[in-house]
UniProtKB/Swiss-Prot annotation:
Its EC number is 2.7.1.2. One of its GO terms (cellular component) is cytosol. It catalyses: D-glucose + ATP = D-glucose 6-phosphate + ADP + H(+). Its main location: cytoplasm. This is Glucokinase. The keyword Cell membrane does not apply. HAMAP family: Glucokinase. GO terms for molecular function: ATP binding; D-glucose binding; glucokinase activity. ATP binds at residues 8-13. Not highly important in E.coli as glucose is transported into the cell by the PTS system already as glucose 6-phosphate.
Length: 321
């Protein structure tokens, strides 16, 4: 067996590749490529392997789209391929293609304390289920359970469940968005575009015309306290993040913890800490006490997708994480 395996984290814009030490799980030699510059994922992989002059026979790539069979067609990119054909073309012994939040969930057992910031709750209960979710371009969700010395990731499309308002303000938001877009999923309010939807709905609810703002604009104005509407939108985003996380905790009894990934929350960390997030997480009526001790963590590791891809592959190859 070779010392290293190839790991990757591929989104709509960029493909990030790295080497994983099969024995230790350590990630090294990470490099990001623009997906727009290459005709296929296989082409990017070949360039990476040629640049790093390393022999690799095993690989695991995390991709931001559902993985339901051999044929993979990326949701937000033109790349499409057969896993079996790519494995053959690259001369690999093993090639795993997994959902991006499967990778993030598999990273959790590998994380150290310095990679996490806790938001309330007690200590995690060893062996109990874990949930992970994260807002970015969309809303990713996965669960993780420990079975017979193996970690089993339970991926899905939980970001597309119905948005469930639990206040008068949230109900008005739902009514306005439903009139605009029809079905309103959680992702429609918990993502970069979702933050824009919240802002627009807040302004429209007051019979005013919203500005044409991007997520970055809303966040910057909210943090500068220069726009009341933006601050309300960001505050509501944090509250809905809490409600959604609490729902995940109830679904599977995630006493192993609820983990937040994705690139949005770290951009306004202090605002998030002071927000109504944790109160909303615990706002479960008769089951408030049930979720009270469930810890929530923000993942601040630079590359959980790469770390988790490596963990998934190593476990597939027989290593115990």
């Amino acid at each position: 067996m070779t010392k290293y395996a190839l790991v990757g984290d591929v989104g709509g814009t960029n493909a990030r590749l790295a080497l994983c030490d099969i024995a230790s799980g350590e990630i090294s030699q990470a490099k990001t490529y623009s997906g727009l510059d290459y005709p296929s994922l296989e082409a990017v992989i070949r360039v990476y392997l040629e640049e790093h002059k390393v022999e690799v026979k095993d690989g695991c790539i995390a991709i931001a789209c559902p993985i339901t069979g051999d044929w993979v067609a990326m949701t937000n990119h033109t790349w499409a391929f057969s896993i079996a054909e790519m494995k053959k073309n690259l001369g690999f012994s093993h090639l795993e293609i997994i959902n991006d939040f499967t990778a993030v969930s598999m990273a959790i057992p590998m994380l150290k304390k310095e990679h996490l910031i806790q938001f309330g709750g007690a200590e995690p209960v060893e062996g109990k289920p874990i949930a992970v979710y994260g807002a970015g371009t969309g809303l990713g969700v996965a669960h993780l359970v420990h079975v017979d010395k193996r970690w089993v990731s339970l991926p899905g499309e939980g970001g597309h469940v119905d948005f469930a308002p639990n206040s008068e303000e949230e109900a008005i938001i739902l009514e306005i968005l439903r009139a605009e877009i029809g079905h309103v999923s959680a992702e429609r309010v918990l993502s970069g575009p979702g933050l824009v939807n919240l802002y627009r709905a807040i302004v429209k609810a007051d019979n005013r015309l919203p500005e044409n703002l991007k997520p970055k604009d809303i966040t910057e104005r909210a943090l500068a306290d220069s726009c009341t509407d933006c601050r309300r939108a960001l505050s509501l985003f944090c509250v809905i993040m809490g409600r959604f996380g609490g729902n995940l905790a109830l679904n599977l009894g995630t006493f192993g913890g609820v983990f937040i990934a994705g690139g949005i929350v770290p951009r306004f960390l202090e605002f998030f800490k002071a927000s109504g997030f944790r109160a909303a997480f615990e706002d479960k009526g008769r089951f408030k006490e049930y979720v009270h001790d469930i810890p929530v963590y923000l993942i601040v590791h630079d590359n959980p997708g790469l770390l988790g891809s490596g963990a998934h592959l190593r476990q597939t190859l027989g290593h115990i994480l």
